[in-house]
Amino acid sequence: MSLNEQWQPSASIQNLLARAKIIADIRRFFTERGLLEVETPVLSEFGVTDVHLSTFSTAFTSPFMEKSKTLWLTTSPEYHMKRLLAAGSGAIFQLCKVFRNEESGKKHNPEFTMLEWYRPHFDMHRLINEVDDLLQQTLDCEPAEMASYQFVFQEHVGIDPLSAPINELIEKARECHLDGAENEDRDTLLQFLFSTLVEPNIGQNKPIAVYHFPATQAALAQISSEDHRVAERFEFYYKGIELANGFNELTDAQEQEHRFNQDNRLREQLGLPQHEIDHRFLGALQAGLPNTAGVALGVDRLIMLALGAENISEVISFNIDCA
């Protein structure tokens, strides 16, 4: 392709018009329900410790600074939004750009649009119902199916993910051609088997909310008080696409700091850079985060489904290859 051809957008104008309408409808959905729209920083002093996320960094320089300061492009507005919740914002939502220094492809672009919202005093199941309402409105689809992680894993893998010995997971992963399966930890094996055998086979005719992920995959979610083997975490899938990831949010600052430190220890073991813990976020938890359920949803993927697009580049004005 010549330089003269590279100026054109990756999406058609028709798709961009449809995108604008969908985003306007999303805003209306939340404002009519009384949520406050907020804006939070795209640049942060802190990266994220999650071993599954890679971040972009930049250098902030000024004539009045002795040396430059590293800043990170946010992978999610989560920490800043929770600081607003701790300050008394009430229910909030945000549509924003986020950045992940990872793959680009049919379903991925390093810069993408995230919808994130938080509902104080909601539990996980009540928030699942609200996500379902949004999907029905946006995609004109049937109501979502609800199923536990344990149920769908047993149905499609034939193994109980919460009690099976690791050798059984290794054997199944080998059957699915995972090289070096014997060297992987339990969570990596579970994630591989879930993405290989479960995700392609669920939510084909209508969305599905999978809830109660293993406690070891809790991230920033609470552990279930009824079954300590699982976390109060859910994900939505539809037609082979992971759409949303939500939690009953962890409010214990000490436990959150412990998880951050665990992440950094694992990063060190994997040869990944460690990240300074966001002490401002921990300060918000210490000050008091209300009991809250929150969820992040990939807007570009939602629009792909709404328009029947095969590639994320069809629904964003300029993908990474022509940005």
UniProtKB/Swiss-Prot annotation:
Pfam families: tRNA-synt_2. InterPro entries: Aa-tRNA-synt_II, aa-tRNA-synth_II, aa-tRNA-synth_II/BPL/LPL, EpmA, Lys-tRNA-synth_II_C. ATP binds at R100, N101, E102, N109, E242, L243, G298. PROSITE patterns: AA_TRNA_LIGASE_II. It is an enzyme of class 6 (ligase). One of its GO terms (cellular component) is cytosol. GO terms for molecular function: acid-ammonia (or amide) ligase activity; ATP binding; lysine-tRNA ligase activity; tRNA binding. Substrate binds at S76, P77, E78, Y118, E249. The keyword Nucleotide-binding applies. It catalyses: D-beta-lysine + L-lysyl-[protein] + ATP = N(6)-((3R)-3,6-diaminohexanoyl)-L-lysyl-[protein] + AMP + diphosphate + H(+). Keywords: ATP-binding, Ligase, Nucleotide-binding. PANTHER family: ELONGATION FACTOR P--(R)-BETA-LYSINE LIGASE, LYSYL-TRNA SYNTHETASE. With EpmB is involved in the beta-lysylation step of the post-translational modification of translation elongation factor P (EF-P). Catalyzes the ATP-dependent activation of (R)-beta-lysine produced by EpmB, forming a lysyl-adenylate, from which the beta-lysyl moiety is then transferred to the epsilon-amino group of a conserved specific lysine residue in EF-P. NCBIfam families: genX, PRK09350.1. Belongs to the class-II aminoacyl-tRNA synthetase family. EpmA subfamily. Homodimer. This is Elongation factor P--(R)-beta-lysine ligase. The gene is epmA.
